[in-house]
Amino acid sequence: MQYAKTSDGFMVRCEIGDEVIATLTKFAADHKIHSGSIIGIGALLNPELGYYDIHTRTYTRKKFDGDYELVSLTGNFARMGETTIMHCHAAFSDIEFRVIGGHLFSAEVAVTGEFYIRAGGTTIQRAPDPLTGLNLMKLQ
């Protein structure tokens, strides 16, 4: 991984073979980013996406084999207790220009992953929400 500090965050380039979520979450934790936002593009392998069913309160997960263009990744960082959490959604396109998207659980860098992390400058916590079954941001 390579990175450069900016006035309000970091530009990060993940290398071939890096697991995106693990690499970026560790980067945020190592740089004490306790809240922030992330956007990115690139080319990834074997993304695993999820769709949250609000009725069953469970994720349907699906792994897509092969390489895909990362058309757009957007998300955020927060804390769950003392642990840094990355929550992001992503859209991918295949060789036929079909687009798939959802909650990103995992993906490996195929060529490059280029990301901009904006540090929030504060700590945002997540906590279980009984209504949705999700770990939501607590902003009070």
How does the language model describe each region?
Residues 1-86, 91-140:
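N-terminal intrinsically disordered, cationic/polar leader segments
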